[in-house]
């Protein structure tokens, strides 16, 4: 986990290993961050990643297969609390 400042905005980066498959992690990400969850707009989904925007910030998630689970990388601006909640769910 770490923070980096780019272009005047502070972004946080998080990583986690999950026992869920990459497809299931992305499905849960859309449920959690999308219109039926936190309410962010789904900007992109596919190819092992998804991005969400809204409220002056964003969430980007990239998922790679790792053994029987997934290696999950998240980047966010303004949605740190929600990203931490999501990481606890996967």
What is the meaning of each model-derived region?
Residues 2-42:
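Terminal, regulation- and interaction-focused segments at domain boundaries
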Residues 12, 38, 46-48, 57-59:
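Residue-level marker for the onset of beta-strands and adjacent loop->beta junctions
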Residues 15, 51-53:
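Mature extracytoplasmic or otherwise solvent-exposed domains
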Residues 38-43, 52, 62-63:
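Short, exposed beta-strand/loop patches in secreted or surface proteins that constitute
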Residues 44-49, 68:
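Ser/Thr- and Asn-enriched, surface-exposed coil loops between beta-strands
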Residues 53-90:
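Beta-strand/loop substructures that line and gate deep hydrophobic ligand-binding cavities in soluble
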């Amino acid at each position: 986990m770490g923070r980096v400042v780019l272009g005047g905005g502070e972004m946080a980066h998080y990583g986690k290993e999950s026992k869920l498959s990459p497809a299931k992690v992305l499905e849960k990400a859309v449920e959690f961050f999308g219109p039926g969850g936190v309410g962010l707009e789904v900007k992109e989904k596919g190819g092992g990643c998804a991005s969400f925007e809204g409220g002056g910030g964003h969430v980007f998630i990239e998922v790679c297969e790792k053994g029987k689970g997934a290696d999950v990388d998240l980047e966010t601006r303004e949605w740190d609390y929600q990203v931490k909640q999501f990481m606890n769910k996967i």
